[in-house]
Structure formats: C-alpha cells, structure tokens
Amino acid sequence: MKLISWNVNGLRACNGKGFQDFFRDVDADFFCIQETKMQGGQLDLEFEGYESYWDYAEKKGYSGTAIYAKHHPISVSYGLGVDEHDHEGRAVTLEMEDFYLVCVYVPNSQDGLRRLDYRMRWEDDFRAYVTRLATKKGVIICGDMNVAHNEIDLKNPATNHMSAGFSDEERAKMTELLGAGFVDSWRFQHPDEVKYSWWSYRMKARERNVGWRIDYFLVSENLKDRIESTDIHNDIFGSDHCPVELCIR
C-alpha cells in the first residue's frame, strides 16, 4: 500500500504546476495534502476512484489539510477535538480497518519564535491525541511537522539553532512524540542519508539544495515491521516542499 504526503503551499497554485500529473503518475492508495489554502467550493478537484476529505481553516487562504483515499474509511474526524486548535484546518484522520491515518499540518512557530508557546500546547495536545488512537490500533501520521529533528535534517544547523523549526523546544517535542511509541519511517530506513523536503524560496535555496527535512511519515511501533519502502521525491516541483512517500505491507 502506497501513501503520499505533500505540502502543496496552495492547491490552486500547485494545480497549475503539475499536481495532477504527479497525482496520477504516483497512483497512491492515500494522497495526503497540507496547506491547501482554500475554502470549500473554490476548486473542484476530484479523481476517479478516490474519495476526498477536507479540513478547511476558518481564515481564508490559510492552512488546510485533505486526504484523497482509494479505500473507504470506517470513520473520518477533523481536528484534534481541542477547540483552541480546531479552527485552522490542521488535521484529518481516517480510521481504516487496521490503522488510523492522520494527515497533519503542524503550526509554524513563526519568525522570532513568536508563536512558540502556542506550538508547545499544540504539540502536547497532538501527542495526546495520537497516543490515544494508538491504544486502539496502529497509527500512521504524515504531513508537514515543521521541525527538522536532528542536525542531519537541515543544511545549516549551526546558523538555524534558534530559528522556527529547529529550536531546542521544537526538537524536544519531536523527541517526546517518537518516545511515545512512534518511528520516523524515513530515518529508520535511511539512518545516514541526507535528503530534504523543503527549501526556502529565497537565495536559490532549492537550486543549491539548502534545505530542511520537515515532512514526515511516522508510524506506531506496531507498524514498524510493515514498512516496505520510503522516499522523498525531491525531483518533483510545484511547491516549496516536495512529496514524501511510505509503502507498507
């Protein structure tokens, strides 16, 4: 079974930059999207053989998550069930027969870490949410988690120590999440490989491969042995992020 996750940085914009070609070529069982940046009815983008589930932000042109699924879920839920967090369209969860799939767009801590306090509350509530799910069946988490966990996960760790996405606090929360029973599937399969999933639009960062790995597939420990392959499609353009892939048995 193949799963894809992609922060498209605006689906309407990405749709004009090859999104549909990649969607059809990759032929995923589940295709998860972050930063749709749209409201219901703004873009009619359905694909034969797929159902789609959308969590829109109340603020127009902001955030938003979605899942295209070939397989009909048992149930669908939106958000974390915490009112403070559930107005920004940041999570869609599908309950399947033997796992939950959570598509998430984690809040950015912003320049000067001005939203870090909120990010810390989000992290604790999100970890509580997915660990509750994991008491019932396996969990697959995918999306833009807005953190490079270790120094290998970004080009310039020394100069980004206090930057959003590489602060000690954010990295520690990722460590806590993994410690709660989850596995970073890419790093599990590629312990020493350097590959990035996001590049700033500034300073020709993508051309020079000055990037960060902030897009993940995490799986609960009881699914670890089902990991077949992982990939980071850094040859696919259309966004400042590239798609990431997980195949499970």
Per-range role (PLM):
Residues 60-75, 193, 205-225:
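Conserved beta strand-loop-helix elements of the APE1-like EEP
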Residues 1-47, 51, 57-63, 78, ...:
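N-terminal, active-site-proximal structural segment of metallo-dependent hydrolase catalytic domains
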Residues 51, 125-210, 214:
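Metal-dependent phosphoesterases centered on the DNase I-like endonuclease/exonuclease/phosphatase
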Residues 7, 23-41, 101, 130-151, ...:
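Active-site beta-strand/loop signature of hydrolases that rely on acidic residues for catalysis
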Residues 1-9, 98-110, 142:
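Active-site-proximal beta-strand elements of phosphoester/diester hydrolases
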Residues 81-82, 107-123, 158-162:
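Surface-exposed cleft-lining segments at the edges of enzyme active sites
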Residues 70, 94-97, 220-221, 239, ...:
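Active-site beta-strand termini and strand-to-loop segments that position acidic
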Residues 37, 42-109:
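Structured beta-strand-rich core segments of catalytic domains in phosphoester-bond hydrolases
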